[in-house]
Amino acid sequence: MFKRTLIALVAGLIAAWGAVAWSQVKEIPWGTSAVGSAGHKALVVLAELLNREMPNFRITVQPTPGAVVTVKGYAMGQFEGYYGSDIAFYELRNDTRRFAGFKASMKRQPVQSFWTYTTDMGLAVHARDKGKYKSWRDLTGKALFTGMPPWDTRAQLERAFDALGIKYTYRQVDLSAAGSLLQGGGIDGFGLYTTGESAVPPWIAEASLATDWAAVNPSAAELAALKKAGFAVLELKPEVFKRNVHTDKVVLLPFYYGFHVGLEVPENDVYRMLTIIEKNVAELAKADSSYAQIAKDMPGFQKLGVTSAADLLPIHPGLARYMREKGVWDAKWDARVAK
């Protein structure tokens, strides 16, 4: 009788402990961009790593129409993780463009916690038309798919076009149809981009099977105007695209993207998350070459990301701790650490 009672008691304690441990698992619904986008692929890879290495968290990848939707979703309590860029954070900070009128309704303030890669924007047309377009201004009035309406990639091109005085006809298309529409003349061009200076998003890789596209670079005068307007400029070799791009280099305009969480995830957990990412970054880069930049220099890339957005939104204390330990923190950011 005593033995049976003891066994039952031990079993009950084990079950109770298991229930407590289970209740301590924090659910992280993490918003990202649409299936087929670079952001969706990258978060799937990251979530697999973090779910394995941080069993106290359960990350679920939540695709949305675009990254800006995830920033707004976090601010309204819909997501615990979000996919945010310096472009989106600028618009949020200044209550403009896609965030016009949004700040007044926010329930919580987004913060920056992990910078992942640059997204590097350019333009492509059909190879048969490459002789027609010697500059971006040559695309004035043309029908272009610059990305889905909420996408930061589209916002980056819109900013560049504004700086150059380019007006075009926006054509929204299904990602899976972009290649066939370019082939058939339904669109004259699309927004071309890489992530991490090395990865082509799945939808462009798919489009490359349906059509032969050529990169179009800004002219020298356009590049000078873009640099004067504050744009960074990047040149990539054609080999990055693993196909003939019909030019000897591809000129792109990079901006910074990250997978961020808010203060609901404590400092120690964000710090641990960053150290786990750094320890396993080769695995991430092998699964998705978007992670090539942080594989080369994780602390240095965090500094670049924070530099791009330090004045736009607060910095998670876990990221600040990581950067201080790595020697890449600037004391001028002390006042920007979220409380």
What are these language model-derived features?
Residues 1-9:
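Bacterial N-terminal signal peptides that target proteins for export
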Residues 177, 194-215, 225-227, 268-339:
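An extracytoplasmic/periplasmic, membrane-proximal ligand-sensing/linker region
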